[in-house]
Amino acid sequence: MKKATIALVALAFAAFTAQAQTTSANIVGYSKTSHAIGYTISAMQFDGGENGPTAVYGDQLPAGSKIYAWDGSGYSIATYGNVFVPGQGLVTKWNSEPSLAAGSSYWVETASAVDSIVSGSVNTAATVTNSIAAGYSLVSYPYPVERTIADLELSPTAGDKVYIWDGSGYSIITYGNVFVPGQGLVTQWNNPTAVVGVGQGFWYETSTPQTWVVNKPF
């Protein structure tokens, strides 16, 4: 359960080279999430190279914590706790390394309240294109920026839904006919100002496969 995701991204130039008219930079960012006891839907919005739970979270989460990575039909589950390592005995570590690659979203379960920090390189591509399958997808906005539903640049069809987890239940936003005074019925999201925070993932439900093209917002 997420008490708050702090919409904080540090944009620090880790490398900067200028020769004639050529400039290159690596932008490094981080997001901080405060987990209460229970479940959070988190998002990986940075490229950190290695992308398993050990690389992403290390020992930040308490023993007994779990990560559930959705593959479209089920979960790969990683647990942080005592694992027997030959020659070392019991070692506290993650027992598996499902991919938490940039652009992915996943559940985090914690047995006690804790803050976690996720960091890595910020995607600076002008656009990012992702495919959304029919059914339910656990997705992430590809840039570490807070967005309203209207700003996500989704390409919805009537009946599509966004599910935002608030720690105890879902806020459900539906795309369809909405009465707008002075305009009548308009096809749009019924809560376009709902917010998806930095480091926060969400469920997307659609009956039609879609291509999601996002333009860099900064």
Where are these regions (language model features)?
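Sec-dependent, cleavable N-terminal signal peptides
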Residues: M1-Q21
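N-terminal exported-region signature
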Residues: A15-F218
